[in-house]
């Protein structure tokens, strides 16, 4: 009976602690997007006094300093902003566009570094909290600090080998499928790196992932795609063929194989793989396959 009573007390205390953590986090969420940074600071200070060892307090401080460091600056230039950002066009007396005015983000680096120090401490103390390094990566991407992004990825992947992808998230909630979350996140980051023109870093990330998951189709396809884009067809083709062998229903892979053979001028292989796409269910790919087969037959 004493053991049962003790267990009930422990569970009750645990539930009370969990509820307290949730309450503080909810209070934080209610004011984090408010423009009043002083109120946010006061709230985090109170939270820290109540839960000084909480990784979420460290994360809250990080977000506070990021918020404090960011300012919007008005840019006046003769070139249009990138990434389809909205801008006010300035016309000259003849009605011709003479310039553009738009807002850009600016950061106070000294304040930003305080935020990074807070988060670095949290990452060191709580290495299984995956949201912490990913939160840092988000800001590093915005600053275009890609070498530092890659270092965070390396640290995360090294940790994954130690913890078996048993990751935690906000409020120390365990992730149900840590391996899937890791892979899916790294795939998103791969796309971000490539879209940012960082193909070398994108390639490095793929190599790291394949060292851990050599049979993963998505990262094998990423590697083959990067090689094909670089016109290194002799290296890309065997990878695509091995993926196709594992997953013959992948019409994108089949299309890439057919395209490489078409580019290399291999008539027999071009006809073979494009013929597999004539009834793939994608009208655009089917149309291209018919056109390419017609061309190949005339070689």
At which residue positions do the language-model features occur?
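Short coil turns that delineate tetratricopeptide repeat
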Residues: 52-53, 127-128, 161, 214, ...
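Canonical tetratricopeptide repeat
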Residues: 60-61, 135, 188, 222, ...
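Short coil/linker segments at helix-helix boundaries
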Residues: 64-121, 125, 142, 147, ...
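Alpha-helical adaptor scaffolds
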Residues: 174-246
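Terminal, low-structured helical/coil segments at or just beyond the last alpha-helical repeat
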Residues: 189-214, 271-299
């Amino acid at each position: 009976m004493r053991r049962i009573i003790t267990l009930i007390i422990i569970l009750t205390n645990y539930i009370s602690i969990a509820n307290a953590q949730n309450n503080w986090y909810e209070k934080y969420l209610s004011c984090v997007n408010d423009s009043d940074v002083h109120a946010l600071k006061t709230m985090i200070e109170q939270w820290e006094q109540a839960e000084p060892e909480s990784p979420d307090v460290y994360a809250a401080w990080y977000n506070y300093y990021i918020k404090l460091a960011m300012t919007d600056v008005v840019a006046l230039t003769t070139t249009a902003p990138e990434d389809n950002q909205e801008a006010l066009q300035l016309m000259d007396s003849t009605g011709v566009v003479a310039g553009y005015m738009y807002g850009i983000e600016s950061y106070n680096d000294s304040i930003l570094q305080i935020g990074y120090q807070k988060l670095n401490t949290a990452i060191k103390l709580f290495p299984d909290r995956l949201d912490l390094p990913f939160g840092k990566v988000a800001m590093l991407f915005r600053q275009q600090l890609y070498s530092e992004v890659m270092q965070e990825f390396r640290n995360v992947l090294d940790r994954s080998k130690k913890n078996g992808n048993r990751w935690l998230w906000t409020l120390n909630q365990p992730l149900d499928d840590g391996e899937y979350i890791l892979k899916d996140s790294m795939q998103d980051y791969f796309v971000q790196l490539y879209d940012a023109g960082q193909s070398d870093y994108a390639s490095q990330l793929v190599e790291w992932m394949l060292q851990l998951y050599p049979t993963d189709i998505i990262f094998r396809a990423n590697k083959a795609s990067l090689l094909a884009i670089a016109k290194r067809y002799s290296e890309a083709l065997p990878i695509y063929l091995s993926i196709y062998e594992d997953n013959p229903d992948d019409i994108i892979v089949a299309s890439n194989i057919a395209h490489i053979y078409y580019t290399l001028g291999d008539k027999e292989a071009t006809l073979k793989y494009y013929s597999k796409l004539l009834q793939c269910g994608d009208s655009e790919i089917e149309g291209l396959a018919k056109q390419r087969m017609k061309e190949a037959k005339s070689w």
